[in-house]
Amino acid sequence: MSTKSMIRDVELAEEVLSNKAGGPQGSRSCWCLSLFSFLLVAGATTLFCLLHFGVIGPQREEQSPAGPSFNRPLVQTLRSSSQASNNKPVAHVVANISAPGQLRWGDSYANALMANGVELKDNQLVVPTDGLYLIYSQVLFRGHGCPSTPLFLTHTISRIAVSYQTKVNILSAIKSPCHRETLEGAEAKPWYEPIYQGGVFQLEKGDRLSAEINLPEYLDYAESGQVYFGIIAL
């Protein structure tokens, strides 16, 4: 029933009761009826406004956990992806500490992982299936003192797609740990410079991915898990 109909019914009832009212108590009855009518109309109007603007009423159904969600943290997205399927391609390789002076990836070390079709060939990860992938990598540089010439450290993740066979940089970063030269005779203080990169990309079966740096002689192998490279199918 609409608010207008409720008001019209109240006015009609008031008119009928006013005609029937008589005697010395007629005016008092009309006054009480008017007060009741006012309260009824006010309540009906308030109820209509609350329903119209959605303040009260049936609650909206919450979005199904299986539906799309674009503001979930990356960790939650990965956890949901892993729970939905355990046969998605994944790889996590670490730096080969037995190859000084160069960055070589290895999959036979502790905490390394190669599963569901991903291969490590020619120091590159080979994508086994089409789809969205999280690509990530971290390197850690270490040195003592700063040379007279500028020192720039680069970390680049590249893709060679099967469709055009051209090496393209998809993630790249550059840092300079030295802002001034270490004076002759001054103490050469140690410095550390980590670089982490990650992103989601649409890849094709057979794509090759590489993670490279420009100055491998500055790599820090002191602790395991400091230099790594990996992909996760989403």
Curated annotation (Swiss-Prot):
InterPro entries: TNF, TNF_alpha, TNF_CS, TNF_dom, Tumour_necrosis_fac-like_dom. One of its GO terms (molecular function) is cytokine activity. Glycans are attached at S81, N96. GO terms for biological process: extrinsic apoptotic signaling pathway via death domain receptors; immune response; necroptotic signaling pathway; positive regulation of canonical NF-kappaB signal transduction; positive regulation of extrinsic apoptotic signaling pathway; positive regulation of NF-kappaB transcription factor activity; positive regulation of transcription by RNA polymerase II; regulation of biological quality. Keywords: Cell membrane, Cytokine, Disulfide bond, Glycoprotein, Lipoprotein, Membrane, Myristate, Phosphoprotein, Secreted, Signal-anchor, Transmembrane, Transmembrane helix. Residues 57-234 are extracellular. Disulfide bonds join C146-C178. The soluble form derives from the membrane form by proteolytic processing. The membrane-bound form is further proteolytically processed by SPPL2A or SPPL2B through regulated intramembrane proteolysis producing TNF intracellular domains (ICD1 and ICD2) released in the cytosol and TNF C-domain 1 and C-domain 2 secreted into the extracellular space. The membrane form, but not the soluble form, is phosphorylated on serine residues. Dephosphorylation of the membrane form occurs by binding to soluble TNFRSF1A/TNFR1. It is found in: Cell membrane. Cytokine that binds to TNFRSF1A/TNFR1 and TNFRSF1B/TNFBR. It is mainly secreted by macrophages and can induce cell death of certain tumor cell lines. It is potent pyrogen causing fever by direct action or by stimulation of interleukin-1 secretion and is implicated in the induction of cachexia, Under certain conditions it can stimulate cell proliferation and induce cell differentiation. Induces insulin resistance in adipocytes via inhibition of insulin-induced IRS1 tyrosine phosphorylation and insulin-induced glucose uptake. The TNF intracellular domain (ICD) form induces IL12 production in dendritic cells. Homotrimer. Interacts with SPPL2B. This is Tumor necrosis factor. It comes from Ovis aries. The gene is TNF.
